[in-house]
A protein has these predicted regions:
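Mature extracellular/passenger domains of Gram-negative fimbrial/pilin and adhesin proteins
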Residues: 2-7, 19-173
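Hydrophobic h-region of N-terminal signal peptides that target proteins for export
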Residues: 11-19
Length: 173
């Protein structure tokens, strides 16, 4: 009799557990993970946060820019990962520049502004030209640049939104 009662209790426990598990069909969260990347033939990889960047300069005073002022400088870093030792890299920035001003990246939005990028030495980079070779150590390396907004050469600063796109290409030695 005790064996029958025990068997019945075990059976009831299993049935009630199964009923609870089967009755809980509410969505308690789900998601999708997409993976992507690119294999490149280079001595270093580029960290994902460096390969596709967005820099927000916020709201900049028209009168300040009109008096040859500049926006707050923003860091523009290119992180190289898993680098081979004894290599160097030259960076070339490209983009639509202001006519006659190879160091000024033109902006879309008719605001009379330009974006400037400078290297670690503080000198503006010339778009379309290779920068000085930078030595790399084994492992991770970060190439440091600064960027800012200014009145475009021969421009008149106007209110409004602007955008600009610069690309960079790396050449290793």
């Amino acid at each position: 009799m005790i064996k029958t009662v025990m068997a019945g209790a075990v059976a009831m426990a299993l049935v009630s557990f199964g009923a609870n598990a089967a009755g809980n069909n509410t969505d308690q969260g789900h998601g999708v993970v997409n993976f992507k990347g690119t294999v490149i033939d280079a001595p270093c990889g580029i960290a994902p946060e460096s390969a596709d960047q967005s820099i927000d300069f916020g709201q900049i005073s028209k009168s300040h820019l009109g008096k040859d002022g500049i926006s707050v400088k923003k860091d523009l870093n290119i992180k190289l990962v898993n680098c081979e030792p004894n290599k160097s890299v030259e960076v070339t920035f490209t983009g639509a520049t202001i006519a006659g001003a190879a160091t000024e990246l033109g902006t879309a939005g008719d605001t009379g502004t330009a974006v400037v990028i400078s290297g670690q030495d503080g000198k503006p980079v010339e778009f379309g030209s290779k920068g000085a070779a930078q030595s790399l150590k084994e492992g991770d390396n970060t190439l440091h640049y600064s960027s800012w907004v200014k009145k475009a050469t021969n421009g008149t600063v106007k209110e409004g939104d602007f955008t600009a796109v610069a690309n960079f290409n790396l050449t290793y030695q």
